[in-house]
Curated annotation (Swiss-Prot):
GO cellular component: cytoplasm; DNA-directed RNA polymerase complex
Protein name listed in UniProt: DNA-directed RNA polymerase subunit Rpo6
Family classification: Belongs to the archaeal Rpo6/eukaryotic RPB6 RNA polymerase subunit family.
Originating gene: rpo6
Record localization: Cytoplasm
C-alpha cells in the first residue's frame, strides 16, 4: 500500500476492505496466514492491519 499520508480516512478504509474482500471471495489468495475459516471481510481487515494489502490509495491534489 503506497500513500502520501499514512492515515486513512474511514471512507478509504471501507473502500479498501470492500474491494479486497471482493477479490478474496472471487478466489484471490489471502496475503496473511489464516488459521481458521474467516469471512473475506475479516481477512481483508487483517491484511490492512498487517499492511500487506496489494492496493494503492491515490488522492487528488
Amino acid at each position: 500500500m503506497h500513500m502520501a499520508s499514512k492515515k486513512l480516512t474511514r471512507f478509504e478504509r471501507a473502500r479498501l476492505i470492500g474491494a479486497r474482500a471482493l477479490q478474496i471471495s472471487m478466489g484471490a489468495r489471502p496475503l496473511v496466514e489464516i488459521k481458521e475459516s474467516l469471512d473475506p471481510v475479516d481477512i481483508a481487515r487483517k491484511e490492512l492491519e498487517k499492511k500487506v494489502m496489494p492496493l494503492d490509495v491515490r488522492r487528488d491534489k
